[in-house]
UniProtKB/Swiss-Prot annotation:
It comes from Mus musculus (Mouse). This is GDP-L-fucose synthase. The record marks K147 as: Lowers pKa of active site Tyr. GO terms for biological process: 'de novo' GDP-L-fucose biosynthetic process; positive regulation of endothelial cell migration; positive regulation of endothelial cell-matrix adhesion via fibronectin; T cell mediated cytotoxicity. The active site is at Y143. It catalyses: GDP-beta-L-fucose + NADP(+) = GDP-4-dehydro-alpha-D-rhamnose + NADPH + H(+). The lineage of its organism: Eukaryota, Metazoa, Chordata, Craniata, Vertebrata. Pathway: Nucleotide-sugar biosynthesis; GDP-L-fucose biosynthesis via de novo pathway; GDP-L-fucose from GDP-alpha-D-mannose: step 2/2. Catalyzes the two-step NADP-dependent conversion of GDP-4-dehydro-6-deoxy-D-mannose to GDP-fucose, involving an epimerase and a reductase reaction. Homodimer. Changing S139N: In allele TUM-. One of its GO terms (cellular component) is cytosol. NADP(+) binds at G14, G15, S16, G17, L18, V19, G20, K147, P170, T171, N172, V173, H186.
Amino acid sequence: MGEPHGSMRILVTGGSGLVGRAIQKVVADGAGLPGEEWVFVSSKDADLTDAAQTQALFQKVQPTHVIHLAAMVGGLFRNIKYNLDFWRKNVHINDNVLHSAFEVGARKVVSCLSTCIFPDKTTYPIDETMIHNGPPHSSNFGYSYAKRMIDVQNRAYFQQHGCTFTAVIPTNVFGPYDNFNIEDGHVLPGLIHKVHLAKSSDSALTVWGTGKPRRQFIYSLDLARLFIWVLREYSEVEPIILSVGEEDEVSIKEAAEAVVEAMDFNGEVTFDSTKSDGQYKKTASNGKLRSYLPDFRFTPFKQAVKETCTWFTDNYEQARK
């Protein structure tokens, strides 16, 4: 039994980020329903680490539903350096958002977790029941524990107040409006920026690490469509993994090759094995998603990479980098 569809005012935190922009696009392209009012906010509208600003935002908007995307995020190397900052800022943001949603009587909150929060030592594929089964990878334990606490809070809000607060766990998201910063972004947007620079300067492409780790990549526009489905139809408090199938996992080397092909790069490609690989794999099961949506069609990886590369090239000046 899903949400009763009727008058809904949906507040999306982190609305200017990768996933927020994708949801905006999907809604604008026809996924929004009559009676739905979508309100996208970013850090310009309120500092969500500040309880008073967060409360004021929620009092003003009076959302019936919330998609909570706002977070302090960064790539592997920034996480290693600033674990305390990632823990504190995200704990503050999440507590402020969930409690403000509760105070204004929001009927549903869908927060965003990440597969990097799962235990470092685990069996594969990982699934929704394993989140708290052991410590996360040491490289980003601050971010991971802060995100795990959303699941703890969701269960507690349900137990104590009957709230339908839930969370989704996407795998590696990429697409337009990503952070393409080479030092600080995630692997695929970093590769796209690197290939762009190598191509424009006629130099070799150096990929950090061995290229062997494997990842499941999900296109932001596919994730946006799934987020909207979760908001309307998914009524469990337990989280749900949003991902392509295990069979669609690709190596970093294959991802680099897809970017090289999409951007028509003809230079030399080398792998710098002195750089850290991070986790070798974090294969996730999308069995739960498929039990609900057996026929959902994901955008083919190469097509999604091509669309993202085209967006980055066309919007190079404005892109986050």
